[in-house]
Amino acid sequence: MALPRLLSAVAAVAACAVLAGAPALADEIQEINLQFRTGDLGGALDHANRYLAQHPKDARARFLKGLILADQGKTNDAIELFTGLTEDHPELPEPYNNLAVLYASQTRYEAARNALETAVRTHPNYATGHENLGDVYAKMAAIAYGKALALDSGNAAVQTKLTLIQNMLGEQARKQAAGKPVPGASPPAPAR
């Protein structure tokens, strides 16, 4: 299955604009983002931590640190960080989206669904959130159909539905593994 995606490094720059802050500090955020995009995850994390020691409430730096932690495989730390962002900035859909991605990676689909439903409720035009919510629903449907088939192995209708969803989820995974771009990673404009 192709898990819903985290905002890409390129989209992180745009997300930093959404998570607006003081222009004088933007250069340092851009430096951290450059380190992140070029794969210097350790350097980016150290830089983000130094920056956040001086600016602990900076949403842009916190968001970027969450992306870095997720890329480093520090899922629980990233979940804690994105959860804090949702508490401090409940109007922003991106932290909810990334929480959902992390929950889905842990097969916590109910938590992922809840986070994505909040993201699209706070920002109904957030296409990435709707797409990822569809992916989570599809995975949950596959699990339910699998359970139904385990209870009634002769049910051809359930087998057909399960096969369709597995094919859809498998096609998404093949496209991502082949490095084909996945549409819709742009964060929305700030809510007014």
Q: What are the residue ranges of the model-derived segments?
A:
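Helix-start (N-cap) detector for alpha-helical repeat units in TPR-like alpha-solenoids
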Residues: 25, 59-60, 93-94, 127-128, ...
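Register position in tetratricopeptide repeats
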Residues: 37-38, 71-72, 105-106, 139, ...
